[in-house]
Amino acid sequence: MGEWTILERLLEAAVQQHSTMIGRILLTVVVIFRILIVAIVGETVYDDEQTMFVCNTLQPGCNQACYDRAFPISHIRYWVFQIIMVCTPSLCFITYSVHQSAKQRERRYSTVFLALDRDPAESIGGPGGTGGGGSGGSKREDKKLQNAIVNGVLQNTETTSKETEPDCLEVKELAPHPSGLRTAARSKLRRQEGISRFYIIQVVFRNALEIGFLVGQYFLYGFSVPGLYECNRYPCIKEVECYVSRPTEKTVFLVFMFAVSGICVVLNLAELNHLGWRKIKLAVRGAQAKRKSVYEIRNKDLPRVSVPNFGRTQSSDSAYV
């Protein structure tokens, strides 16, 4: 149960930051109606799945062969695999968004430190720092020059007059640089566009996986679990009858998982409609345009090799004029 709790927390981390309202409803459906029910109820229902699959024969290996024929993949294992695969696009989106946030934080800190180191004398002295005249002004300026910048804070480093003057801290105020603000705004806009594009892509992949597992579940099990299964598979000598434990309960559980998968598909389509098919097309075209621009830049940066022309040169005496 601890593994499911970790997966639930990871999904909540992605949804709380970047998901839409429909995405949050979808997370509730996935967490409550899939993870919790499969982890708690499913293990109880399918605990004796193979041990209680009994065939009316004493032929060695016949029970195992017929069980493999009736259930190529156990219901509970199929649903666990479905949950993991369907949640994989969301986990990839979490990794991408966390990576982009870390990069944005590093850029912001580097911009602040560059601004701090650009003109420390001006920030320490400041306009009017030498004003006041006389010995009093020079003393104040000497004290300011003895301050040091530590992470954007001016800290007094004077050691000779500790008894007479207490340490003082002066917060350095940075004037916003117009070009820096424009660069930060552009980088933030690019980051938001990248995150939105990746979110749309993961919703599309998640919906494709939902539909694939829904179709696979239908072809593997149908809509019901029969109580009696007839089998003539080797090594059974003749056709034997096998009995499945709790067929009605398993049928209800199977139909319930069909309904949950159908609801997830509908919610994914509704989220894509909410995001807008036009935005999805623009996101795909934006990715293609970005790849094209990178290709053009690379071709432009490649050195051009001039090939000498060894053909005939035209002149007034040439016969080809």
UniProtKB/Swiss-Prot annotation:
Residue ranges crossing the lipid bilayer per the database entry: 20-42, 76-98, 198-220, 253-275
Amino acid composition bias (Gly residues), ranges on this chain: 125-137
The UniProt record lists the keyword Iron: no
GO biological process: cell-cell signaling; chemical synaptic transmission; neuronal action potential; visual perception
A single GO cellular-component term on record: gap junction
GO MF entries: gap junction channel activity
Region described as Disordered: 120-141
Residue intervals annotated with topology Extracellular: 43-75, 221-252
Domain of life: Eukaryota
Primary site of residence: membrane
Record's bilayer topology term: Multi-pass membrane protein
Keywords: Cell junction, Cell membrane, Gap junction, Membrane, Transmembrane, Transmembrane helix
Keyword Transmembrane helix listed: yes
Coiled coil region boundaries: none
Cell location: Cell membrane; Cell junction, Gap junction
Function of the protein: One gap junction consists of a cluster of closely packed pairs of transmembrane channels, the connexons, through which materials of low MW diffuse from one cell to a neighboring cell.
Assembly: A connexon is composed of a hexamer of connexins.
UniProt similarity note: Belongs to the connexin family. Delta-type subfamily.
Name the UniProt record assigns to this protein: Gap junction delta-2 protein
Organism of provenance: Rattus norvegicus
Organism taxonomic ancestry: Eukaryota, Metazoa, Chordata, Craniata, Vertebrata
Gene name for this UniProt entry: Gjd2
